[in-house]
Amino acid sequence: MKKVFFKTFGCRTNISDTGVMMQNLKDFELTANESEADIIVVNSCTVTNGADTGVRSYVNSASKLGAKVIIAGCGAFSKGEELFAKNKVFGVFGHSEKEHINTLLKSEERFVQMGDLTSLDDTIVSDYAGKTKAFIKIQEGCDFRCNYCIIPFVRGDARSQDESKIIEQIEKLALNGYGEFVLTGTNIGSYGKDKGTSLGKLVQKIGALKGVRRVRLGSIEPVQIDESFREILAEPWLERHLHIALQHTSQKMLAIMKRRNHVKRDLELFQELSSKGFALGTDFITGHPGESEAIWDEAYASLEQFPLTHIHAFTYSKRDGTPSATMSEQVKGDVAKQRLKMIESLVEHKNIAFRQAHHLPLEVLIEEGKEGLYSGYDQYYNKVTIQTSRDILKEWVRVDDYDIRMEANYAKF
């Protein structure tokens, strides 16, 4: 039986997609060692140039191992055919084809099978190999058309998974011992708009299921937080961390980016959620075309007011085919990187201030560790490192006594 190795790049949605592919692999053996694989499936990301570079570099190194290299994921749409034409990969397939992976990998002929951008998966994933938490894809695609973003062109328009299928998958995973569920998708806040329901209503039902200990949400847009979502904020099973995508804190830049959020309303929302004890994360792009010194100064001064604890910040990456790619007022790379460092430093200090102000008992799911040193994430999505002689891998641990350090909270018992 031929052995298959999966290499997953990018977001939590890709982790979920890899789970779907593994679940449908019936006539092959999975391996965790790429050097012994007959076939290497690269579930790729294309959100930035850096992501493309990482995938391309891995494909080059993987091809030297003698295995057939197959590219899937978002990069299949942006770079797949180019890699195929250069004989860098044996095959390419799109999102809608991943449930046919068992047949595709049997092909003796090189192939490109892109499929469509309208389908949803039917597979119920019952296990995530090597993972302590389960990733539940509740929707696919995005109806937003932000000027810098290529993702709608490689994931399609927003479409919601059937609620019954989501519930069934979580129930099966809970029976298999999973207690933390991470809801993923391209734009999860759009869940239900095509089905007459909402994200808040779905999450309320998930939280009521037997075995669900913690629900973590992927990124949400500020405009998607409605009353049904506010109704779940006090629920004990909801992670006390929310990731709300701002992308920028200058109103002028938001207009240039064609974003739907508004700085003043965003700040009010963040202050409301912070007052309820939530840790708050966001995305931020520095160096987007048009980000003048005046706009940057305005944005930084505004960002200082936000009660943030986490940030996923990155410099602007030109994506061919997007409106931003043709904008003339480019920002120098070194300037964008310096601005990136500024906001990362700002939020790093905000994070430790939050932890000092919320020195409360922590509930930690231990995700990795060995030889007496373990780590996991608490209900605020902060890393906790634990030194102990006990084997606590994959356990839920309550931590009352701990030190607050810049890089993580630290406990010993």
Please report, for each region that a protein language model flagged, where it lies by residue.
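Proteins enriched for Cys/Gly/acidic motifs involved in redox and nucleic-acid/cofactor modification
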Residues: 1-190, 227-231, 242, 263-272, ...
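Residue-level signal for inorganic ion chemistry
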Residues: 41, 74, 101, 183, ...
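Conserved strand-turn element in the central/C-terminal portion of the radical SAM core barrel
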Residues: 45, 149-156, 214-223, 250-259, ...
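Conserved glycine-rich "GG(E/T)P / GGGxP" loop and the immediately following alpha-helix
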Residues: 46-51, 178-205, 209, 220-228, ...
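Short beta->alpha connector loops
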Residues: 75-76, 222-225, 390
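Radical SAM/AdoMet-radical enzyme domain recognition
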Residues: 175, 200-209, 214, 225-284
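Short, electropositive alpha-helical surface patch
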Residues: 195-207, 227-241, 291-309, 333-338, ...
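Terminal RNA-binding accessory module
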Residues: 326-413
